[in-house]
Regions:
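Primarily membrane-embedded glycan-assembly and transfer machineries that use lipid-linked glycans
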Residues: 2-165, 189-313, 358-375
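Contiguous hydrophobic segments
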Residues: 143-152, 172-178, 241-253, 322-341
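Membrane-interface alpha helices of multi-pass inner-membrane proteins
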Residues: 163-186, 285-292, 325-328
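Aromatic-enriched
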Residues: 312-375
Length: 375
């Protein structure tokens, strides 16, 4: 079977039907989730928009009285990200949330269209997203997952275009701090121009945010990050340590397990950066950026569509089980499915693409064969 081609003798017919099925499923499922959301529609988006409105009103952006992750109105994002929400905050309710939700759908659609994989794989990703509970949940909440997915997809596509790659890494880091680990990958693969471009974008964003929001805003941001209660005991947290705690393991041992998880993930990222292909190293870092988070919400799993696309492109059709394990039809599965899915997505590209005995520190970046063949 040729990698990236739909299996079976009916592949041409499947290829023609796939876009229709993918669109119908995605629109139906996501539409149903949004229609039934009620007051939870835009739950996270409202926190972003209110922070932007506080900025517009000259008030303090961060509410340091909240100390529970996931609490209503909690805003943990960086000052530069607040500026991105300002245009939406200028709109009246409920148009602000509607516009934000539409922007998330557009961002995800653009990301899928730009994935450096073949057309049928892109439509498979749309289909899997339509079935994905994490994706529907992220859109319902107005969470930043689709924006981050776009940044990561752009970084993958622009891997050999340093300025664009650097900008994509920087914007991803502004959206969520954890993708900053991509800079480690870029350093280890000697993408100095991309690192420089990314740091320049970050420096510019910090300077603008400081001028607009004030120097004290950074202190308030760090204060609220420090004040959030213990992540292991946070409800609905899907890190390995938190899942073990929910299953009955003591807080101390669960915390130790989470430390082991973090150290192991970091070690794998470093190893993948220097011992596998640039693409595998990048996707490993992208997946790890979420698995390293002290609080792993279920909607973060929508980002696993990225390594899934890479695996499907190479004919590993079993990879569809990664997002399907957290699909809306299997929502009854136990919480442990989330850390397992993340770890499979982290290790599978390495297992498929590892090149033993070859160090990429001395290797020039390789062009993606899919991009090279596309017009």
């Amino acid at each position: 079977m040729t990698a990236g081609r739909l299996p079976g003798s009916g592949a041409p017919l499947m290829g023609r039907l796939l876009p229709v099925v993918a669109i119908v499923v995605a629109v139906t499922v996501v539409g149903a989730v949004l229609a039934s959301a009620g007051p939870t529609l835009g739950y996270d988006a409202r926190a972003y928009l209110e922070a932007a409105r506080r900025l517009l009103d000259g008030r303090v952006i961060y509410d340091t009285s909240i100390d529970q992750a996931g609490a209503a109105g909690l805003y943990l994002y960086s000052p530069p990200f607040t500026l991105l929400a300002v245009p939406f905050a200028l709109l009246p309710a409920p148009l602000d949330v509607v516009a934000w939700t539409a922007a998330l759908i557009v961002a995800f659609s653009a990301a899928v269209a730009l994935l450096p994989v073949r057309r049928e794989i892109r439509w498979l990703i749309v289909l899997l997203a339509g079935l994905s509970w994490p994706f529907s949940y992220a859109v319902k909440l107005g969470q930043v997952g689709p924006i981050l997915f776009l940044c990561l997809a752009l970084g993958w596509r622009w891997m050999d275009q340093p300025l664009r790659l650097g900008a994509a890494m920087a914007i991803g880091t502004i959206v969520k701090v954890q993708p900053g680990i991509l800079f480690v990958w870029a350093i280890l693969t000697r993408r100095w121009a991309a690192v420089g471009a990314g740091l320049a974008v970050l420096a510019g964003a910090v300077a603008i945010a400081t001028l607009v929001c004030g120097v004290d805003t950074w202190g308030a941001w760090l204060t609220i990050l420090r004040s959030i209660s213990a992540s292991i005991t946070t409800p609905h947290n899907f890190t390995p340590g938190a899942v073990a705690y929910q299953a009955g393991l003591g807080e101390g041992p669960a915390g130790a397990l989470q430390v082991v998880n973090t150290v192991a993930v970091l070690a794998i990222v470093l190893w993948a950066a220097v011992r596998t292909s640039p693409t595998v190293g990048y996707l490993t870092a992208a997946t790890a950026s979420q698995l390293l988070s002290p609080v792993l919400w279920d909607h973060y799993a929508m980002l696993l569509l990225l390594p899934t696309a890479w695996l499907l492109e190479r004919g590993r059709w079993w990879a569809a089980a990664i997002p399907l394990s957290t699909s809306i039809v299997l929502i009854w599965l136990p919480p442990v499915v989330y850390p397992v899915a993340f770890w499979v997505a982290l290790l599978a590209p390495i297992a498929i693409g590892a090149r033993p005995g070859r160090r990429l520190r001395a290797q020039r970046p390789e062009p993606d064969p899919v991009l090279s063949s596309e017009t």
